[in-house]
Regions:
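Charged, often Cys/His-bearing segments associated with DNA-binding zinc-finger transcription factors
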Residues: 1-42
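Basic, short loop/linker segments at the boundary and entry of helix-turn-helix/winged-helix-like folds
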Residues: 30-72
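Short, conserved catalytic/metal-binding motifs centered on acidic residues
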Residues: 33, 68-70, 85, 105-109, ...
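Alpha-helical scaffold/interaction cores of sigma-54-like transcription cofactors
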Residues: 76-79
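DNA-recognition alpha helix
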Residues: 84-95
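Short, basic alpha-helical nucleic acid-contact segments in DNA-binding proteins
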Residues: 93-96, 108-132
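Structured, charged N-terminal subsegments at the starts of enzyme catalytic cores
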Residues: 129-132, 137-145, 150
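Conserved small/polar residues in nucleotide/adenosyl-binding loops
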Residues: 152-154
Length: 154
């Protein structure tokens, strides 16, 4: 009795296959992904203090909410380097979705962080935390360590 070896079969694979329509980034991101929370919270922020820092004339700028979204998501993903955030905006679907397929470079990201957020970062952070608490996304508890007020996520 001889055993015939069966030939392995594989699913069709053609990386060069064209498709009629490219997939929507919206369809590729799960409904419960944290990137959706970032987008929702940043969209609700009052950014008047940031908008005041922009002067009229010259080349158009990336919208401050776009820049905040990619920075906040970067920080949540432990990505702090403007160069790494730039790379992510070009290659990671979550960043692409947040940025609406816009691609700010590392210099633009860094200038936004150092110039536009310079005096308002604490206010922006406070708004983000407040919105997240109001929406039940986080619970905070006040604790004191060595006399320092700290907020922790429970």
């Amino acid at each position: 009795m001889s055993k015939r070896r069966r030939k392995a079969t594989f699913k069709a694979y053609n990386p060069d296959q064209l498709s009629l329509l490219p997939p929507s980034l919206e369809d590729l991101i799960p409904a419960n992904h944290v990137v959706r929370v970032v987008r929702s919270v940043i969209d609700q922020l009052n950014i008047d203090n940031i908008l005041k820092k922009y002067k009229g004339g010259g080349a158009s700028s990336y919208h401050p909410k776009l820049m905040l979204k990619i920075l906040v998501y970067g920080y949540l993903s432990n990505t702090y380097s403007s160069r790494k955030i730039e790379q992510s905006v070009q290659s990671n679907i979550h960043y692409m979705w947040l940025a609406g397929m816009e691609t700010p470079d590392h210099n633009t990201i860094n200038r936004f962080r150092t110039e536009k957020l310079k005096d308002v970062l604490k206010e922006v952070f406070a708004q983000v935390v407040t919105l997240m608490v109001e929406q039940g996304l986080v619970d905070i508890k006040t604790i004191y360590i060595d006399g320092t007020l700290s907020l922790i996520h429970i």
